[in-house]
Amino acid sequence: KQAEQAAGLMVVSNNIERIADRCDEVDGLYKKILDNGQLLSDAAIADLTACMDMTEKLFGESMNAIITGDSETPDKVAADKKKIRKLQRQAGKAHLARVKKNTCVRSLTADYSALLYSMDRMADNCISIAEEAIDDFTFDKLDIENMDSDSEVMVKAGAQA
């Protein structure tokens, strides 16, 4: 049981780390845009914000599935992932339409697409987290009162670190 718990925790941890990496990518891309003296249009920012808000919702749902052990949440997360993909496709098409109308800069197309792609990958990681709930992985709470003294010392030492 402990080995399964450890493996599940590693999967969740790995996916959270990947989400953090994608956040760094988004931050780096946006800084690159600003460093080049360019700005995203208000419409582009609104589209990206909608995608990021949905991704944030997905992350919350995924973590809730792990915390509660709700095995139905992964299906909800997968449905929301489809909504994110639809938002991202719409955002990409809207960007190209703005480029045609000269309300967005063509040179930002690659960076804008990369921003959308990073959010898509975050959503994939959220699904992987939620799927751990299907495997009955949940964060067990430690019962400190019933632990032996060595375990209690380790828990207290960890809490002080």
Q: Can you say where each PLM-predicted feature lies in the sequence?
A:
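Cytosolic, long alpha-helical scaffolding segments
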Residues: 1-161
